[in-house]
From Swiss-Prot:
Name under which the protein is recorded: Glycine betaine uptake system permease protein YehW
Subunit structure comment from the entry: The complex is composed of two ATP-binding proteins (YehX), two transmembrane proteins (YehW and YehY) and a solute-binding protein (YehZ).
Residue ranges of the TM segments: 9-29, 47-67, 102-122, 124-144, 162-182, 207-227
CDD domains according to UniProt: TM_PBP2
Listed SUPFAM superfamilies: MetI-like
Membrane topology: Multi-pass membrane protein
All ranges on the Periplasmic side of the membrane: 30-46, 123, 183-206
UniProt topological domain (Cytoplasmic) ranges: 1-8, 68-101, 145-161, 228-243
Disulfide bond annotation, renumbered to this chain: none
GO biological process: amino acid transport; amino-acid betaine transport; glycine betaine transport; transmembrane transport
Keyword annotations: Amino-acid transport, Cell inner membrane, Cell membrane, Membrane, Transmembrane, Transmembrane helix, Transport
Family: Belongs to the binding-protein-dependent transport system permease family. CysTW subfamily.
Species annotation: Escherichia coli (strain K12)
Domain of life: Bacteria
Length: 243
C-alpha cells in the first residue's frame, strides 16, 4: 500500500504504460492530427528505443562519472593542484561546445552510430560531476583528514574511506545533473544513426509530423523526471547516512 502512495511508482507506471500504449494510440492522434497519414511512429518499437536510449545515457554517464570524479580527486591532491584551473577550463569548454558540432566533427572521423554520440554526451556530462566532486571534497573539514592521517591511513585509504563517503551526497547531486542533461541531449544522437527516443522527434521534425515529436518528447520528458526523482531519493539516503 505504501508503494501505491509513492509518486515515483506512478511515474514509472505511466512511462511503462505509454511505451506499450503508444503503438495502439492511432485513434487519438488521428483525431488530433487528421491531416497526417501516419500519426503514430511505428518504424521501431518504443520499448526498443527506450532501452537503446537508456543504454547510451548509461554508458556515457559512466565514463563522465569516472573522468569527472577522477579529475576532481586528482586536482585536489597537492601534486595535482596546479592543474586545477586547466582541468576546470577544459571541462567548461566541453560543456559549452554544442553537441551537434561534436557530432559533425566526429562523424567523418569515427562514422555514424553510437561512438560519436557517446563522445558528445561524455563531454556534456563531465562538468557537473567535476564541479560537484571539487565542491564535495573542498567542503570536508581539514581536521577530519588529519584525524584519519593520525590513525595511520594512507592517502588512498583516506580518499576511499573518509573523503569520498563524506563528499558522496554532493558528488551524487552532480551525477544527477549530468544524467538528466544526457537524457535530453541523447535525443540528438538520432541525427547520426543512433536509435534513441529522439528518433521519432528527429523524423517528426524533418517530416513535419507533430504527432511523432509529441510521442518522443513525452517519453524523454518522463524519463528525465523519473531519473531526477530517483537521484533525489539517493541523495537523501546518502545525506541521512552521512549524518
Amino acid at each position: 500500500m505504501k508503494m501505491l502512495r509513492d509518486p515515483l511508482f506512478w511515474l514509472i507506471a505511466l512511462f511503462v504504460a505509454l511505451i506499450f500504449w503508444l503503438p495502439y494510440s492511432q485513434p487519438l492522434f488521428a483525431a488530433l492530427f487528421p491531416q497526417l497519414p501516419r500519426p503514430v511512429y511505428q518504424q521501431e518499437s518504443f520499448a526498443a528505443l527506450a532501452l537503446a536510449h537508456f543504454w547510451l545515457v548509461g554508458i556515457s554517464s559512466l565514463f563522465a562519472v569516472i573522468i569527472g570524479t577522477g579529475a576532481g580527486i586528482a586536482v585536489t591532491r597537492p601534486w595535482g593542484a596546479e592543474f586545477r584551473p586547466l582541468v576546470e577550463t577544459i571541462a567548461a569548454v566541453g560543456q559549452t561546445f554544442p553537441p551537434v558540432a561534436v557530432l559533425a566533427i566526429a562523424v567523418p572521423v569515427i562514422g555514424f552510430g553510437l561512438q560519436p554520440a557517446i563522445i558528445a554526451l561524455i563531454l556534456y556530462g563531465v562538468l557537473p560531476v567535476l564541479q560537484a566532486t571539487l565542491a564535495g571534497l573542498g567542503a570536508i573539514d581539514a581536521s577530519v583528514t588529519e584525524v584519519a592521517k593520525g590513525m595511520g591511513m594512507s592517502r588512498g585509504q583516506r580518499v576511499r574511506k573518509v573523503e569520498l563517503p563524506l563528499a558522496a551526497p554532493v558528488i551524487l547531486a552532480g551525477v544527477r545533473t549530468s544524467v538528466i542533461i544526457n537524457i535530453g541531449t541523447a535525443t540528438i544522437a538520432s541525427t547520426v544513426g543512433a536509435s534513441t527516443l529522439g528518433t521519432p522527434i528527429i523524423i517528426g521534425l524533418s517530416g513535419f509530423n507533430t504527432a511523432y515529436v509529441i510521442q518522443g518528447a513525452l517519453l524523454v520528458a518522463l524519463a528525465a523526471i523519473i531519473a531526477d526523482r530517483l537521484f533525489e531519493r539517493l541523495v537523501q539516503a546518502l545525506s541521512q547516512h552521512a549524518k
